[in-house]
Amino acid sequence: MLKIGPYEFQSRLLLGTGKYPDLEVQKQAVEVSGAEILTFAVRRMNIFEPNQPNFLENLDLTKYKLLPNTAGAKTAEEAVRIARLAKASGLCDMIKVEVIGCEKTLLPDPVETLKATEILLEEGFIVLPYTSDDVVLAKRLQELGCHAVMPGASPIGSGQGIVNPLNLSLIIEQATVPVIVDAGIGSPADAAFAMELGADGVLLNTAVSGAADPVKMAKAMKLAVEAGRLGYEAGRIPKKRYATASSPMEGMSVV
């Protein structure tokens, strides 16, 4: 069970809703993914323009918890303004804080992320900040009182997978709130690996929406997250330098 603030979820896969070929493919992918939390960029939504089409009209919103994000914000002030706009729409009380500090890498600005997180927590938001794999920054965000931390596996949309498993492991080890690996996931193997490291969840978008068959990939990601979590809970065997026979010679009959 994934617990974020007062909410509990069966699925540990969080799915982004952008860049799908069309709304029907998006709907099918969302459904087969089993995801219960859907994220979207507030700036790309027509939440106050009912005559304009948006993906919300295509989904049964009783099945999902919406997680708007502040994509496009470059300062804490912009992120806070976007978050307030999302809350005013009446659709949600959770917010993914995303303050980009570099246009080329789309890596988050740590200082502005901390500022925005602190303000939004004071205003009563359920805050999930997108951050780098900086161990100390993740700790600071946690100490502020955020409801989850979302370290990136690698740059957004890069598909590079987990480039620094050590840092992610350290973030997970020190965490007292859920750790949701966000950004850079490119394949089911990446998602499974994140879960095997002990992450509480995985958020991805491009890996599904950009796949040759987004619906099949959504199902693959669902199974990968489940398998990775089971593997983590089961406990992998330790790595050793030399072989150990699975059928020891002791006790064997002489043929």
From Swiss-Prot:
Parts forming coiled coils: none
Residue sites binding 1-deoxy-D-xylulose 5-phosphate per the record: 157, 183-184, 205-206
Entry keyword annotation includes Ribonucleoprotein: no
GO CC annotations on file: cytoplasm
Active-site residues, as the UniProt record annotates them: 96
Keyword annotations of the record: Cytoplasm, Schiff base, Thiamine biosynthesis, Transferase
Pathway terms, separated by semicolons: Cofactor biosynthesis; thiamine diphosphate biosynthesis
GO molecular function: thiazole synthase activity
SUPFAM superfamilies: ThiG-like (SSF110399)
EC code: 2.8.1.10
Domain of life: Bacteria
Transmembrane segments: none
Catalytic activity: [ThiS sulfur-carrier protein]-C-terminal-Gly-aminoethanethioate + 2-iminoacetate + 1-deoxy-D-xylulose 5-phosphate = [ThiS sulfur-carrier protein]-C-terminal Gly-Gly + 2-[(2R,5Z)-2-carboxy-4-methylthiazol-5(2H)-ylidene]ethyl phosphate + 2 H2O + H(+)
Location in the cell: Cytoplasm
GO annotation (BP), single: thiamine diphosphate biosynthetic process
Keyword Nucleotide-binding: no
Assembly information from the UniProt record: Homotetramer. Forms heterodimers with either ThiH or ThiS.
The protein's role, per its UniProt record: Catalyzes the rearrangement of 1-deoxy-D-xylulose 5-phosphate (DXP) to produce the thiazole phosphate moiety of thiamine. Sulfur is provided by the thiocarboxylate moiety of the carrier protein ThiS. In vitro, sulfur can be provided by H(2)S.
Homology family: Belongs to the ThiG family.
Name the record gives this protein: Thiazole synthase
Gene: thiG
